[in-house]
Amino acid sequence: MEIQAAFFLNPMFFRFCASHCTVKFLHKLLNHHGLVLPVPLRNNETEIGEIAMEQMELKKLQILSAKIRIDILEMLVHCGQGHLGGAMSLVETMAVLYGKQLHVDPKNPQLEDRDMVVLSKGHAGPVWYATLAECGYFPKEWLFTLNQGGTKLPSHPDRTKTPGVDMTTGSLGQGTSSAAGIATGQRMKGSKRYTYLMVGDGELNEGQCWEAFQYIAANRLNNCIVIIDDNKRQLDGYTKDVLNPFSIPDKMKAFGFHTEVVKGQDIEAIDAAIDRAKAVKDQAVCIVLDSIKGAGVKYFEDMVSNHSVKFNNDEVIGEEKKAVENLQAWIEKEEPSCLS
């Protein structure tokens, strides 16, 4: 008989283990049921109770990621086409930012002293819209107006139209300079907030990116956290074939950035990398996401041209429907364990 995850996430279970179980035994038990217990640990109630909360938080971010993926798929199939691949590769990063890391207020999107987000790869707007809707910035019904006349959700982000969008982007490269300016302004005001700049690997074809990076590094803007979505593909092919970027991490290090690489679909790794980035002083910081374009749905991951997908035949629509059903079934199974 399957044991529900809620049983393992219950603090009472961990209190029992603190008194009656070894940490080694607890590792084996949780791993058997698909949960992870970090090491090393002391075998005491306080620390094991903290792990219960960490597992709960991780599960909530995983569920948020699944909901964002569903929203992206459903809004694009309703629209008939859209930028799927690069939106899906950023799902986990957006979930970590808005689900945990950002100092923002959905009820007050223009909060004066808030963290700022710049999605320089503006064609990935659907992942931003889905995240904002899930976090309560606007009604989810708006998602089905994507790129339609009179919409508040244009194909590329527009700060004058969408609550929660801090900068208009879409012309590749320009968001990097905008983020550099915003971070400079934050520093001049003495703000302790951060600017999160998300850039695509294909976008690095634009020279403006490197001009902005040089400025960010030279001015040691450690409050501007650069996140590069290295999903290996762009509009017209693989990045290595269009204009080989060689080693993006080496380039960023050479520019003066404290740089690390994490798996782009690993929530815990992304979250930990952002924590480490915030701890860096007197140096610009960059996180390179080793990500998968179209991530989360094998059919779309394997699609050769998944930058922009047309939902205009039975096969593609059928795969979208199957993916949504699978994600919804997983949420229905896992979400009860996270309800307080």
Question: Across the structure, where does each feature detected by a protein language model lie?
Answer:
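Short, Lys/Arg-enriched N-terminal segments with co-localized hydrophobic residues
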Residues: L29-A52
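N-terminal capping segment at the start of a domain
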Residues: S65-Q81, D229-N231
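Cofactor-binding active-site loop characterized by glycine-rich and histidine/acidic residues
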Residues: I72-M75, A87-A218
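Generic beta-sheet signal
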Residues: D115-V117, R193-L197, C224, Q283-S291
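Thiamine diphosphate
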Residues: G164, T168-V280
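Glycine/aspartate-rich loop-and-adjacent alpha/beta segment that forms the canonical ThDP
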Residues: I267, A273-S340
